[in-house]
């Protein structure tokens, strides 16, 4: 049974964060895990991610299945937002089709985006800035990333990384 929540995942170079989001964007059942231990070996990252998602859903089975899964990656994506092209801090996630194989394994819709775009969307909502004409978000984690939104649309550029400051590893990140 699908219910009115979305499973959100933030795949970072150090941690994977997961949680249930309801229709009011409230976060519940937050979980944090190690990215390198789950995805770092690169042997079957889609299988590992599918197993992680299934385990999360089993742990929260009283909520039923999510309506969809939304995943943010610290990556360059293809224009269709179905494939990871480059993920410097997680080498096993380079040139990797994500949405189609995960949808087949999980029988749920899967959406991916750059993690910084999803972080900026959250900040726009939390700070009531949805109508702002130009917004730039800079985010620090394992690396440094940024997102630019102009007139309600993300600035992606020809290769999906317009304005990107780069995947710069930070000491202690």
Where are these regions (language model features)?
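Glycine/GP-enriched mid-protein hinge/lid loop-to-helix segment characteristic of carbohydrate kinases
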Residues: 3-7, 19-21, 28-32, 39-42, ...
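Glycine-rich phosphate-binding loop and adjoining helix at the ATP-binding site
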Residues: 36, 41-50, 64-69, 76-134
């Amino acid at each position: 049974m699908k219910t009115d929540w979305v499973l959100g995942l933030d795949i970072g170079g150090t941690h994977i964060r997961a949680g249930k989001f309801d229709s009011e964007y409230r976060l519940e059942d937050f979980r944090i895990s190690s990215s390198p231990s789950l995805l770092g070996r690169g042997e079957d990252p889609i299988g590992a991610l599918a197993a992680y998602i299934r385990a999360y859903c089993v742990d929260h089975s009283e909520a039923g299945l999510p309506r969809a899964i939304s995943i943010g990656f610290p990556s360059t994506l293809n224009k269709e937002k179905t494939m990871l092209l480059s993920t410097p801090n997680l080498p096993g996630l380079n040139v990797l089709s994500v949405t189609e194989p995960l949808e087949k394994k999980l029988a749920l819709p899967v959406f991916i985006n750059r993690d910084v775009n999803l972080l900026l969307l959250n900040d726009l909502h939390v700070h009531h800035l949805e109508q702002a004409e130009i917004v730039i978000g800079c985010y620090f984690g394992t690396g440094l990333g940024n997102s630019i939104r102009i007139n309600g649309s993300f600035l992606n550029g020809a290769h999906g990384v317009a304005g990107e400051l780069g995947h710069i590893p930070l000491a202690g990140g």
